[in-house]
Amino acid sequence: MKFPFTRFSLSWLILTLSPVQAEPGVFTSSADLGSVKLPGSATYNATEESYTVTGGGTNMWATADAFHFTWKQMSGDATIAADISFPEATRDPHAKGVLIIRQSLYADSPYADAALHADGLTSLQYRETKGDRTYEIQANSTKPSRLRLEKRGKYVSLSIAGESGDLEPAGGSFRLVLTDPFYIGLGVCSHNNDVVEKAVFRKVEITNGTTPATGAKPRLISTLETVPIASRDRRAIFTTIDQLIEAPNWTPDGQSLIYNSKGRLYRLPVTGGAPAVIDTGSAIRCNNDHGISPDGKTIVISDQSTPDRKSRIYTLPAEGGVPQLITEAAPSYWHGWSPDGKTLAYCAERNGEYDIYTVPATGGTELRLTDAKGLDDGPDYSPDGQFIYFNSDRTGNMHVWRMKTDGTGQEQITKDGFNNWFPHPSPDGKWLVFLSYDKDVKGHPENKDVSLRLLSLTDSGKEPEVLAKLFGGQGTINVPSWSPDSKKLAFVSYQLVP
């Protein structure tokens, strides 16, 4: 049998509450949130243990939401999972059923949701602060049989299940700081304020807290993602469990991404799919400092397969082949290729000092460009070939610097309260992306709270913008990862789960 939930109307910022009654199921209340023209509803079928939610509203997007929500309050770590279906034909492919966690019941509240759209699109959506715009991470899978939204500490993530019914990480997570208590529940938005749509949620499971097995080692989830510079809406391309992947390069034709894992290089279609190993001959301990020549014909690697296990730079054909040694001296870590394809830039340790060097792409005598005390690292060329951007801790904190390609004219670019690493100019010369750690983090370790930030190279007065906040660091964007049209960036994010 079915039981209606207590309903009340919540307009843009005004709350009107009808008499509260005891409710069945796991939720306590139900309401339309935001500017909703037609009232929605939520009912619970105790026999089938299912929830049917109808909702209107224009969207759950931008700076405010309009939908029907049924909820309970919780604190701490929490998960909510359900099978979601649309029993009737929807009038808009963007109508969606969601599993949702919200800070408040106001329309512009911070929130995160796992959204299944009527057309099968599946995504993790979020608003970081009150009144901010909504962002999303699209899963590289459609029409999953089950979704799970998980809040663990200050990170939120999505898992989905296919035909097997087994939930697996959908890839990508983001930082969302909520105070206790928060609201958790189910929602429906019709994406058309003149109609209501219906979704059924079955096998709803809500858990509070995570209890890992005694002595259990956290599992590593690596996700290769892309993000458009214009929308900032991320897309998970490829996800692995218990296998570290690092440092994607975008091929010049825009069709593939190259990354490293367990000492090997792999090529992956930019749309996702099965990765293919690239033959690197005897070089089977490739690290995360690799790239592709401007003409797309050659790959450069930094490999540690020699008996001394020190990194040296090699080149090989893009389709794979026998590596050619470029730097005899070690350790050497590649980071940049000149736009004309003739010169490689890299970080190397010589006589106890890490500095920036260049060498002809075919091998030869290396040229030292920096000699400041401390670490100079991460060199990458500007697309016009006039400058090399790099990071240096010569002033105390790690910051982005720039110099001419002969090493002269060294100038500091960033001067903020972060440690900034691995600057990469966009191919069109308009943007500089780099990785930022908190100022108290030493080095560029893995598994830290980091931000990808963008600095305009055409507006000298503009402050860096946050492109994405994630759990990452070492391996996220060590090397150039711009799409050839400068519209997107590839990177790797990580999760550690019990």
Each model region followed by its residue ranges:
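Sequence signature of WD/YWTD-type beta-propeller architectures
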Residues: 210-498
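Bacterial N-terminal signal peptides
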Residues: 9-18
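Short secondary-structure capping/junction motifs at helix and strand boundaries
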Residues: 4, 92, 322-324
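Extracellular glycan-recognition regions
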Residues: 23-214
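Bacterial N-terminal signal peptides that target proteins for export
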Residues: 1-10
